[in-house]
Every structure is written in structure tokens, then in C-alpha cells.
């Protein structure tokens, strides 16, 4: 006969997908700040510097992958740091544990601490070197076992135009790799982005200008959008990674589900650890439910599981 296994007290479900999570931020979960930009400066950037050391990256990768699996997450789109060793450590561990994982070198060549920016080599600038390293990492890891590569500008304000242009060129050259970044999370961040890229109609449009919006492009947050932004998401096939625990924790605002549905662009849920406060998809879903009820445009919108 057939062997029957009883699992009382367990839920048997397909693996969850976490659309946006930061591997180097596990240790800064729950660090309080007045908003996104001070939080980056005071907690996140200092923590990410540790990942220059391969042994720190490897140790963090072991814990991070185990936490995802412990919470039932079997696919994750993940930010690493600006150090290639952090990317290699995370891919190596994900491959060993058979996790479906997409990550990439964090592209960041300005407006962050000097030792966290992409570093130059010989006569090559940090910008050039970061693009060469990105291509080498695509060739080494993309499509190996269950792994995929994502071209990963941290967010537009920490990349020069040259770096964003180079990232867009790589996105065109490798159409089956992913793209991931952040957009329209926080009012101060938006004002900063608009000041740095005055030629763009909006913060989101900056990414489109540099060829970074297409199918397989995932943008975290997408909170403060108008209908032109929503239409741009729809027409390019890009998707939003909605991060409700992070948005509540950092006081960033609420994703407008009704607006997204009205215009019709794709979105999914993300933990956004460490701005987000839990690896658990159940915590994320509960927070999404609360956010849906508190949302900007429609009081009392209840998110049904069909969402």
C-alpha cells in the first residue's frame, strides 16, 4: 500500500515567492529611524560594509537562506551588496540548498559612503568596473540550476547617469535576466530623485529613460504613483514588489491597490527585510490586509485572497 505521512499542526502549501528582500540587512531588522534615508545612513550602510569580507558574506548567506526556507519561501528576489563576494556567497549557498534565488551586484557609484560604492580597479572607474563585474556575474550564474541574475541599481539617486545607461545596455543585451530596484517609496527620496534627474517626467520615468523597464523588471514599493506612472508600469510589463511591513515600519505610505487594479499593472508581495520586520509570508499577508484597509484612496478596501 501507499505510505501515509501525518503532519499535524503543519500547513502543506506550494512554496512562497518573496519578491524583494535584502540579504545583508538581516541584522538591522527593527532598527528605528525617522524615515528611509536616515535609516539607510545610520543602520543599513554601516552593516553592508561588513560584506566586503568573504567569510562574513558566507556566514550571513547560510543564515539568510535557512530563514527563507524555514518560513516556506522557495523563490526570492534578493538584494546583495556592492561587493561581488556577497553575490558569489549568496548564489553558492542558494545553489547548495536548491533555493530558487535571483540576485545581483548592487550598482551604486555615488551618494553613499566611499567604501560602499562600487570600487574601481587599475585605470577603470568604479562605474566601469561595476558594469564589467555585472556582466561576468551574469555569465557565471544566470540560469545555473535554479538561479537567476538581476541587474540591480540600488535606486536611481545612488547611480550616475553613466551607470544607469550601462545597466540599461546590459538589460538589452541579456533580455532574460531580471532587473530590480526601488522607486517612489518615500516623499524625501522622490524629491531627491527628481532633483537629480530633472529631465524625467517622474522618478519612475527615469528608469524607463535608461532602458530599465521591461518584462522581468521588478520595482520595490511603487507607493507614490500617479496614473502616468501606473500606465508606464502596465505598458512596459514591469511589476511592483509591495512591501507592507516595511512601509508600516518606516512610515513610508501605503501601496494603492485600487489604483493599481484600475490601471492594471502587475504586483506581488515582498518582505523587504530589513526595512520589513519579518521573513514570514504570513506576516506580510496580514500587513498587506491592514494596508489595503487603510489605503490612500479607498477606506475599508478588504484584500481578498483572490488578490
Model-derived features with residue positions:
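Catalytic core of soluble alpha/beta enzymes
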Residues: 185-217, 222-235, 248-258, 273, ...
Amino acid at each position: 500500500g501507499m505510505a501515509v505521512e501525518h503532519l499535524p499542526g503543519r500547513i502543506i502549501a506550494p512554496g512562497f515567492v518573496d519578491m524583494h528582500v535584502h540579504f545583508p540587512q538581516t541584522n538591522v531588522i527593527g532598527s528605528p529611524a525617522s524615515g528611509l534615508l536616515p535609516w539607510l545612513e545610520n543602520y543599513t550602510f554601516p552593516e553592508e560594509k561588513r560584506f566586503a569580507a568573504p567569510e562574513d558574506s558566507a556566514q550571513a548567506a547560510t543564515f539568510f537562506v535557512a530563514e527563507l526556507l524555514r518560513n516556506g519561501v522557495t523563490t526570492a528576489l534578493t538584494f546583495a551588496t556592492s561587493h561581488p563576494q556577497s553575490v558569489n556567497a549568496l548564489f553558492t549557498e542558494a545553489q547548495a540548498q536548491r533555493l530558487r534565488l535571483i540576485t545581483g551586484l548592487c550598482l551604486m557609484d555615488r551618494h553613499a559612503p566611499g567604501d560602499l560604492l562600487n570600487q574601481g580597479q587599475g585605470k577603470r572607474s568604479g562605474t566601469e568596473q561595476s558594469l564589467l563585474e555585472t556582466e561576468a556575474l551574469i555569465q557565471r550564474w544566470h540560469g545555473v540550476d535554479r538561479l537567476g541574475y538581476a541587474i540591480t541599481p540600488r535606486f536611481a539617486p545612488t547611480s550616475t547617469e553613466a551607470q544607469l545607461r550601462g545597466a540599461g545596455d546590459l538589460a538589452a543585451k541579456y533580455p532574460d535576466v531580471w532587473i530590480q530596484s526601488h522607486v517612489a517609496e518615500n516623499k524625501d527620496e522622490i524629491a531627491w530623485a527628481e532633483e537629480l534627474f530633472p529631465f524625467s517626467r517622474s522618478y519612475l520615468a527615469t528608469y524607463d529613460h535608461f532602458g530599465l523597464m521591461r518584462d522581468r523588471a521588478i520595482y520595490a514599493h511603487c507607493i507614490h504613483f500617479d496614473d502616468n506612472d501606473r500606465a508606464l508600469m502596465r505598458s512596459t510589463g514591469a511589476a511592483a514588489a509591495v512591501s507592507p511591513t516595511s512601509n508600516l515600519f518606516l512610515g513610508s505610505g501605503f501601496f494603492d491597490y485600487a489604483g493599481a487594479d484600475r490601471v492594471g499593472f502587475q504586483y506581488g508581495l515582498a518582505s523587504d527585510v530589513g526595512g520589513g520586520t519579518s521573513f514570514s509570508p504570513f506576516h506580510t499577508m496580514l500587513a498587506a490586509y491592514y494596508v489595503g484597509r487603510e489605503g490612500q484612496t479607498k477606506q475599508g478596501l478588504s484584500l481578498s485572497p483572490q488578490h
